[in-house]
């Protein structure tokens, strides 16, 4: 609700298209019920249970035995959102330094001293540092002298590939299968222009690589046809890839967001953000509230 209100206020393009989480087999019904129960415990009270006929009425191309319908789920112009956030920060006096990587740092009596590289290298002394470096957050934390290494999680990379659908859009809702261990499963995403993509899958990698392997298409067809049997051969092609900033290895239970503040590591003014994968963008404003609270700033927690 915070995000929708912000988008309406700032004119960020978005649309509440709704989402279906589908059980492709009877064995997955119990998992759907677990999702519903967990959602209710987290304050999500608008999920509706749909039987096969109700799903068919909403999305005739979707095959399943049951589904959860989330009417409040939507899509957004993520680039416009980030520009809006940047504009808000700069309006409040922030200076954004692009291509300025932090190479090292150390804890001092006066705060945190950072060595910053790039076009204009500098030494920066700060009272507060928020390490929100995504894939590189553990590496940045390790580069700060004085921070206990044992408190820094190991970084693991789980690549997520997307394939693009050619032809007419067969869905009006986002369609998600029952989640798998390391991700949300290969699901249907729709952008504001109507382009349909399927993904992401899970590909564990040792080094950062954003190329999409065309050879992964067979696995995509198999996964998508579990809930979209009408997908024709040759209808999808490689799109793009992202990489999840995991802090557990392949086979481990997925970790929740880690917001590590002074109470956790004992360094005043430092907050580390680890494992901020999807839905980190959706939760950005609430994450910011948590960071501010960890730094001792008063926070107004509007709903």
Each language-model region and where it sits:
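Active-site substrate-recognition segment that forms the wall
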Residues: 10-14, 123-128, 132-266
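A short, glycine/Asx- and small/polar-enriched loop/turn
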Residues: 27-31, 58-65, 106-113, 248-254, ...
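C-terminal lid/capping helical subdomain adjacent to the catalytic/cofactor pocket in oxidative enzymes
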Residues: 254-303
């Amino acid at each position: 609700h915070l995000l929708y209100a912000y988008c309406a206020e700032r004119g960020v393009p978005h649309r509440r298209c709704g989402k279906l989480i589908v059980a492709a087999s009877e064995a997955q019904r119990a998992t759907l019920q677990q999702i519903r129960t967990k959602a209710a415990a987290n304050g999500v009270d608008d999920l509706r249970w749909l039987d096969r006929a109700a799903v068919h009425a909403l999305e005739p191309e979707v095959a399943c035995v049951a589904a959860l319908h989330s009417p409040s789920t939507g899509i957004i112009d993520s680039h416009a959102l980030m520009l809006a956030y940047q504009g808000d920060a700069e309006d409040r006096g922030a200076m954004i330094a692009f291509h300025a990587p932090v190479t090292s740092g150390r804890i001092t009596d006066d705060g945190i001293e950072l060595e910053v590289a790039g076009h204009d290298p500098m030494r920066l002394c700060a009272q507060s540092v928020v390490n929100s470096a995504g894939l590189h957050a553990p590496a940045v934390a390790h580069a700060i002298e004085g921070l206990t290494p044992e408190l820094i999680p190991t970084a693991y990379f789980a690549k997520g590939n997307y394939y693009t659908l050619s032809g007419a859009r067969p869905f009006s809702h986002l369609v998600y299968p029952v989640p798998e261990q390391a991700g949300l499963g290969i699901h249907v995403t729709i952008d504001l222009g109507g382009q349909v993509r399927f993904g992401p899958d899970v590909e564990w990698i040792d080094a950062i690589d954003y190329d999409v392997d065309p050879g992964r298409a067979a696995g995509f067809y198999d996964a998508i046809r579990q809930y979209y049997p009408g997908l024709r051969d040759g209808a999808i092609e490689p799109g793009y890839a992202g990489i999840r900033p995991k802090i557990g290895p392949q086979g481990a239970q997925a970790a929740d967001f880690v917001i590590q503040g002074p109470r956790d590591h004992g360094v005043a003014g430092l907050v580390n953000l680890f494992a901020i994968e999807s839905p980190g963008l959706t939760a950005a404003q609430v994450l910011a509230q948590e960071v501010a609270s960890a730094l001792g700033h008063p926070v107004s927690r509007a709903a």
